Regions:
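S-adenosylmethionine
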Residues: 1-437
Length: 437
């Protein structure tokens, strides 16, 4: 068996699952269950498969440049396998061309692409010749089209980002969408403290550092084979939560004895953070309309040994009708709204290809309904925090501005927008803090 064949085959299988509509992280998990790879193999497979997903448009340009048949006419299975080979040749500098080609061709030979192994070999070898001669695909000189091609983003999305932040910042954000995302943990301060847990990780030869300005944030500096096999998982000493997301719950400043609503709670990283900040001594109602996601939340609550949270399967936009006793009941409300997730494209590489302007418009309508529906549940002296993991202003500050204009009795106390940056870790995030006048 050619060295590296299984890793390429697994990566190709991930692309096939993603093309069928499975989320990239779920596809990775499903495929890895069928193999026994070590941590280095898993890191390689993750980089290769997720890189192919991110750079789909860029890799298609190279297929069009080096093949007689354009990418749109390639059989899908062949197209994705060509992406596996091309990504290694174009984006993975440490892999020799010969190894990239031979291992990728071997996948074709040992699967139902056997009859096309010669085609794979020819296209990849032709690509090497083009690389060596610096004969690259012709890319438009138009800045937006060029950025779309080089950073492999839908052109409609690039136009939107440029409209939001300008071309210079858009280039930085586009690069950030293609970098390897950080893996951040939030320490469960109900059970341990940051320095103690860092020492525990160091004893296990796990490279991790504290995140500045976050009381309980830790960054893992290398990919573990399985996140659940890290020390302290079973004991509930930590949860996975991006550093930008860890800014949200503290804005609400949950206190002992307060009644708190998390209106879109599952899978629960912010719910458990609220409980943690209130020393597990608040009355927290976690609402979500997905029973499956609520089960994940309940599992997290049990693992972290959090007792102050009760869950409710419901649509938060209907809470006033189904639970009228909750009107003016809550001291604090968190709406971590369903959103386009544009701030997390590095972490969710397939999202860029499934998003559309129409989907965003539908989400905006839902976000507006959530704000209008949940506001009556807040006490007159209460605080509401609205958050998203997007950088789209129509879902963020523009939406909040319209909400304030419509509801004259409330005011904006503060808002924060975090943009993804190529040279800094962290997702894009937005949060607004609102209260009655």
């Amino acid at each position: 068996m050619i060295k590296g064949y299984l890793q390429r085959k697994a990566s190709w299988e991930i692309l096939l699952k993603v093309s069928s509509g499975i989320y990239s992280d779920h596809a990775l998990e499903k495929v890895l269950k069928n193999y026994e790879f070590n941590s280095l193999d898993i890191a390689f497979i993750t980089e290769l498969s997720f890189g192919c997903i991110r750079y789909r448009k860029f890799l298609d340009l190279w297929i069009d440049h080096t093949s007689k048949l354009p990418h749109v006419k390639q059989p899908p299975k062949l197209r994705w396998l060509l992406h596996i080979g091309l990504y290694q040749l174009l984006k993975m500098d440490k892999i020799p061309f010969s190894a990239a080609i031979s291992s990728t061709v071997e996948v074709a030979k040992k699967t139902d692409l056997k009859g096309l192994a010669g085609t794979v070999n020819a296209i990849l070898r032709n690509t090497v010749r083009h690389i060596e001669k610096e004969n690259v695909p012709k890319i438009s000189s138009d800045e937006i089209e060029r950025l779309s091609s080089l950073e492999s983003l839908p052109i409609w999305l690039v136009k939107e980002i440029v409209n939001w932040v300008g071309i210079k910042e858009a280039k930085n954000i586009a690069k950030a969408f293609n970098k390897k995302p950080s893996i951040d943990l939030r320490i469960n301060s109900l059970k341990t403290d940051l320095n103690k847990f860092l020492n525990e990780l160091a004893e296990c030869n796990i490279n991790a550092t504290a995140i500045s300005q976050l009381k309980n944030g830790i960054a893992l500096n290398s990919n573990p084979r399985s996140i659940k096999k890290l020390p302290g998982y079973r004991d509930g000493l930590w949860v996975v939560q991006d550093r930008s997301s860890q800014w949200v719950a503290p804005l609400l400043n949950p206190m002992k004895g307060e009644k708190i609503l998390d209106a879109c709670s599952a899978p629960g990283s912010k719910t458990t953070h609220l409980a943690q900040l209130a020393n597990d001594d608040a009355e927290i109602l976690a609402v979500d309309r997905s029973e499956k996601r609520l089960k994940i939340l309940q599992s997290n609550l049990e693992r972290l040994n959090i007792k102050s949270v009760k869950t409710l399967k419901a649509d938060a936009t209907n809470l006033v009708d189904i639970k009228p006793n909750l009107i003016s009941y809550f001291d604090k409300i968190l709406i971590d709204a369903p959103c386009s997730g544009i701030g997390t494209l590095a972490r969710n590489p397939d999202s860029r290809w499934s998003l559309s302007k129409d989907k965003i418009n539908q989400l905006i309508l839902l976000q507006e309904r959530l704000l209008e529906s949940v506001l009556p549940l807040l006490k007159r002296n209460g605080t509401l925090v609205y958050s998203t993991c997007t950088i789209c202003p129509e879902e963020n500050n523009f939406l909040i501005k319209r909400f304030l204009t419509k509801n004259k009795e409330i005011k904006l106390d503060s808002e924060k927008q975090i943009l993804p940056k190529f040279d800094e870790p962290g997702d894009g995030f937005y949060a607004a803090k609102i209260s009655y006048k």
